[in-house]
Amino acid sequence: MRQSACINTLIRRRDNASEPKITDSISPKEASPTLLSRLGFLVALGFLRLTSVLPLRLLHWIGGGLGWLFAVIPNRSAATTRRNIAACFPALSSAEQESLARQSLKGMVCTGLEMGKAWILPIEGTLAQVTEVEGLAALQAVAKAGEGVILLAPHLGNWEIFGYFACEGIASNFMYQPPKNPQMDALLRGVRAKSGIQLAPTNRKGVAILLGALQKGELVGVLPDQVPNDEGGVYADFFGESAFTMTLISRLAQRGTPRVFYGFAQRLPKGKGFKVIVH
């Protein structure tokens, strides 16, 4: 299912309140985790471990049921999804828009259920989730030639599995905004470490790290559909809306002559894994 997870999130419009500033640290504020945060982490970890061993086909079946619940029970994600689809696809009938919204909500839930495969399995198990590949050879050839590469990985399909597979064997650098829970942050750092991906903070220092990586001929990964901080974006027309859009990619692309690719991991039917597609 190709629907983007970002269609389930609110586009930052001109009339929205300002987003919080990005801090100068890659780590969450130093604080002892509370009992509630520890319990929350243990529940999340148990969930991830369970879903890491369940078959994809079963996870997608469960995702279909939970996605249906998200569609019929009033909630913010469903309302936002319908609003965004109406703005992006005004020519579709109400029934067609609703069908697309339900597919998107199902995809959103399936992505959450798949994270155990991305975060808990050994890297070999994560990479084995990919069963089909299209267009990756061109990216690998450029990267191995020592040319700088900018890889855009939007919230489409399963972006975590895509990132690990596309960057396997390539010196790679990604920006990372840590979660508030320090234990979850430690888990995710370990996940990135197993793949060899280097992390850059989401601030000026991080931008400098990415620029340096491009100059060394390495790969830089960016999730282009994230809402930037106040200093990192401009308002641009997007399906009739004035949406706050990051400028980082254009800034990176103007430094030197990096090659720009984008891609995603498409969810295959019947739990047959993922197809990595790169353009």
Enumerate the language-model features and the residues they cover.
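Membrane-anchoring hydrophobic helices of lipid-metabolizing enzymes
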Residues: I11-A153, D185-L187, K194-G196
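Soluble catalytic domains of membrane acyltransferases
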Residues: T111, G116-H279
